[in-house]
Curated annotation (Swiss-Prot):
GO terms for cellular component: cytosolic large ribosomal subunit. CDD domains: Ribosomal_L22. One of its GO terms (molecular function) is rRNA binding. It comes from the Bacteria. It comes from Symbiobacterium thermophilum (strain DSM 24528 / JCM 14929 / IAM 14863 / T). This is Large ribosomal subunit protein uL22.
């Protein structure tokens, strides 16, 4: 049973979120949440929220045990970019691109041996 959760339009660049997502992919939900508490990256908070949401969805909607869940898929897609301009010398303007991310996490129940 695959259970999915996503956070859209997170105001962090996808490149920065992917660093954090790569660390937790394939780990158990409890292990990933414990790991994310100690990662000194701004992206670790929204990633932890999405993982916790996916685990809560699995518990509430499908009556799965949170301890048996692992992160089967975790990926980040680029959202819309907010374009801003920074005024420069002689009437010039340099663009500032404020990038957004769509974070998606899919959790599965571990197979019983």
């Amino acid at each position: 049973m695959e259970v999915k959760a996503s956070a859209r339009f997170v105001r962090i660049a996808p490149r920065k979120v992917r660093v954090v997502i790569d660390l937790v992919r394939g780990k158990s939900v409890n292990e990933a949440l414990a790991l994310l508490k100690f990662i000194p990256k701004r992206a670790s908070e929204p990633v932890a929220k999405v993982i916790a949401s996916a685990a809560a969805n699995a518990e509430h909607n499908f009556s799965l045990n949170k301890d048996n869940l692992y992160i089967a898929k975790a990926y980040v897609d680029q959202g819309p970019t907010l374009k801003r301009y920074h005024p420069r010398q002689r009437g010039q303007a340099f663009p500032i691109l404020k990038r957004t991310s769509h974070i998606t996490v899919v959790v599965k129940e571990k197979e019983a041996k």
